[in-house]
Each structure stands twice: as structure tokens, then as C-alpha cells.
Amino acid sequence: AAATSDIPILGTSITAYGVALDIDDFNGTVGGNISGTSDLADLEAQANMITEWFPEAKKVGLLFCSAEPNSRYQIGEVAKCLSDKGIETKEFAFTDTNDVASVTQSAADYSDVVYVPTDNTAASNTEAIANILVPAGVPAIVTTGKMAAKILTGEADISEMPIEFTEATPKYNASMCETLGIEPLEGYTAIEE
């Protein structure tokens, strides 16, 4: 963004634009030559999912990479939502791939449920995380092209385009539910493998 103010820049899957661009009073529109889509899920809905699926859960581990500001933002918001519901949370932050396993083990030892935000390092280490949480019996809760067309055809001015969010469908991992003995809830769709 600092390299040009003339060429439209559309970001894809940026979780929190205000955080990523260090904008204190972010109102949904970046302005200038930047807009895009966010992969930010409805964090309150995710906190609700934890309490719906696991009503007996008292301690939720928040597993994330401390080097990713967008992950820290999500963790803070989910922690607030869970705290409002009377659920204790504890952060388990790894710094990179090298300490994912040890930090995940600590999270598994502490938690009734582990929450993992949209986090690049966690996503690339899904198997390592699952290999620790599953044996421990701890469950884990884990439109840009159209915008470009509007800019290129003159239908939209990028300086006035708000950040768009993808629509979410509540889903569950059927094989993981079976492995952990969890009965899927109504209103959720199984992830197709």
C-alpha cells in the first residue's frame, strides 16, 4: 500500500484490516486505494458454538501464533465473549512451527475445549495439533473477485468500498465427532471430505 496510491489494491482473506493496517478508528472502509475481503468469522457465533456444543465446558484454551496480529485480535474478542458467559479462558501462544506441539500439549492438559482462530501457522500445523488434541479427547473449534470486477468496470470507487465478509455456514467434522463421541447438533452441516 505504501508503494502506490494509484493502483487499486484488493486484499484477500485479511482477518482484521484495521489491525493489519494499524488503523485505530477503522469503520469498515479503508479509503484511498485499498479494499478487499476478510476471512474473519463471527467471533460471538463461535463463542456461542462452544457453549452450545459443550455446555459443560468450564475452561477453554485459546491456541494461536503470537506472531500473527490478526490471531491475537480474534483471541481477545473470543475471550471477551466467553468471559461474558462465565467461561474461563487461557491463552496458549506458540511463536512458530517449532513450538506448536509443546504449546498444544499444554493447551490439551488445561482445556475442556480448545479454540483455534483463523491462524496461518495453526492451519499449516493442523495435523500436529490434531495428533495431540484427539488422543487427549479435547475437541477443537476451528467474494474478492466480484469486487475487482466492480472496480475494473467503473461500477465502484475503491476508496468508498467497505471491506466485505464471507458468509459462514456452521459446520462440524463428522469423523472427529465420531472419534470423540460427540453427538452433532441440529442446524450444523457436516464438512464434506
Model-derived features: positions:
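Hydrophobic alpha-helical segments within soluble ligand-binding/sensing domains
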Residues: 17-57, 144-154
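Pocket-flanking alpha-helical
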Residues: 1-3, 19-24, 98-100, 123-125
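Short beta-strand elements in bilobed, periplasmic/extracellular small-molecule ligand-binding domains
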Residues: 33, 79-97
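Periplasmic-binding protein-like
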Residues: 1, 10-12, 60-63, 111-123, ...
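An alpha-beta-alpha
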Residues: 35-82, 162-176
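Structural motif
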Residues: 93-109
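Hinge/cleft segment of the Venus flytrap/periplasmic-binding protein
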Residues: 150-193
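Venus flytrap/periplasmic-binding-protein-like
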Residues: 7-21, 130-143
